[in-house]
Amino acid sequence: YSSAQGDAALREKLASYVNEQHSTNLTADNFYVTVGAAASLTISLKALAEPDDEFITFAPFFPEYRVFVEMTGSKLVVVPSRKEDFQIDTKLLEDAITEHTKGIILNSPNNPSGVVLTEECIKEVCAVLEKKQKEYGKEIFLIADEPYRELVYSDVKVPYLMNYYDNTIVCYSYSKSLSLPGERIGYIAVSDKAKDWKQIYAAVCGAGRALGFVCAPSLFQKIIARCIGQTSDISIYEKNRDILYRALTEYGYRCIKPDGAFYLFVEALEKDAN
């Protein structure tokens, strides 16, 4: 076994890399190594959730979010994204936040649309969260689900959400960036600017234990420590995207050309049966 929080040397390297890439000020004590992004999400939700809490996400979304949220006894509230570009409609977000809202889940690049949220959109979302925190006198957390962070095309930039909002928890996985989905390795990063972040980190540690994860795979923790900052060949995904997008749109299908990930979210030519 490794430490439940993850190998100390790996966590030091993670902190150093994230600080270098995103101008943060994290240490090893902000990182908790996990069994992939699904574990990162379930642990984070378990650490934050209390009875009657609500978490907001944005359609289209990874369907397991509902399972992960409801596992904690909380409710998932789904807000539709703007149909024309799948960016977030902040008016709808503001209307959806209530006194029961514990946090929101943002996934960028998005599964299944491949859309990357723009910096302008993120700033607007964070402004709404700040406003609602003051209105309700409570913390509202931003859970950043980022397994596709490196899978972007044409020099698209993915804003690092921790730099835009203090109460942020980042959930990351190496499944996509290193093409290692079956090896189950990732991490949680708790912002050092979050209110009572050490208590949040302690809750993350407790949630990981309560959910029975024990520790991330020890061998792959050693491997990841030597691969930080590397990716598999992203150009293959970009080539496939271009071929499929061109073919589908030539046949008359409508879809937004994805900025990242490896999905095309295609609108059917037929009307919805519902």
Give a label for each model feature.
Residues 2-5, 9-12, 16-274:
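PLP-dependent class I/II
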